[in-house]
Amino acid sequence: MVGIWKATGSHPKGCDPFSFKEGKSLKRIDKLVRSFVNEAMSEGFELFLSPETEVLRDLSQINDDVVFFQAKGGGLFKLRRDYTATIVEFYNKNPSDTLRVWYSGFVYRYDQTGQIQNTFQLGLEIVPYNSPQDSFVVLKVLIESVLNSLTDKLLIEVGDSRVIERCIQHVPKKFRKKLLELVDRKDVSELEFFASLNNLDLKDVLKLVEASFTKRSVNQLKEFELDPSIEREIVELVEFLSKYPGVTVEIDFSLARTVEEYDGPTFILFDLKDPALIAAGGRYRVNENTLGVGGTIFVEERTWSR
């Protein structure tokens, strides 16, 4: 997704979003887009169109994550940061619609130096989510379009937001954003210091982070003492992914980025031949009564601007 997986921030394993090395042909992007669109349309997805700019009527929306500008007439506009948020907003305004859509276009964010960065996204969303088959079809489109165009060796990390939510439910909300940032960095000593500094019990969180290094095999699921329904979902997802030649599946329940927006299984795709983060997504909450599922392929600006 991203949709809502902010995978263009810091990245697991030190990987950057997908890009090309010097001298590699941009024909691969063309092949990727064609393959993605063909796969999406063959599965019944329809094109979703949305402007890159939106009138900023509520000034309380302005924060460090919002890229905005003032037009000549004085009005404030914000640039699209995330497609999934736009699709969720559309669905909530039109709740009778069933959305099975694909999209392509640019999103904008600030980097660590305060400069605006562009990322091209190819993604798809299903709202409402009805069954694990919805997750499978999203993954099918992502995996097959990537294997047909970019690489023949993928690592897919599978997690579940409910696992880490259970570990942090006792942590005061004022500490959670920073805590999840530390979990993403997987620095055990930094987490221990944070726990000591703020008098927090983070032993379950630390176990998850440590397990992300030592217990990544799907055969070790029993060691996590998961709720049976969660374990069953993960097993079904792993079984589905394992049928693809060239795909390696590992478990990482410490995947914490935007955990507050997810509600269930999550996934990240990495290229193993030319290490890079390629795609991410998962199941998320649309409103109090509705879930959705989606996934997004990321292509950074340096890929096409050379």
Regions found by a protein language model. Give the residues of each.
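Short, conserved secondary-structure transition motifs
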Residues: 158-171
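Polyanion/phosphate-binding surface patch
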Residues: 17, 48-77, 101
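Short glycine-rich phosphate-binding loop at a beta-alpha junction
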Residues: 155-160, 250
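Short low-complexity, flexible loop/linker segments enriched in glycine and/or proline
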Residues: 61-67, 170-172, 266-267
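Intrinsically disordered, low-complexity segments enriched in serine/proline and basic residues
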Residues: 8-17
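Positively charged, Gly/Ser-enriched RNA/tRNA-binding surfaces
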Residues: 5, 18, 25-45, 53-55, ...
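Intrinsic disorder/low-complexity segments
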Residues: 2-4, 8
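Acidic, His- and aromatic-enriched active-site or binding-groove loops in soluble protein domains
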Residues: 67-73, 173-195
